[in-house]
Amino acid sequence: MMEKKTIDLSKSVFEIASAYPEVKDIMSELGFTEIVKPSMLNTMGKMMTIPKGARVKEIPLSTIIDAFTLSGFEVIN
């Protein structure tokens, strides 16, 4: 059985993207286009959480959670 991939929304975008590189593609498709730039991921990504980014970008958190769930992730916190 495959290990469940878990995204903890209390962690920084940088931590999540480091653990699961495919998260960058999912988030980029949702409108977080800066995430694919290493400089942005290494600076803002270390301070930003997905819920904070969702508020800034005005993307419903439910949309983001649905996209992760469809990609096989479990979302917590």
Region roles according to the model:
Residues M2-N77:
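Compact, charge-rich alpha-helical regulatory domains located at protein termini
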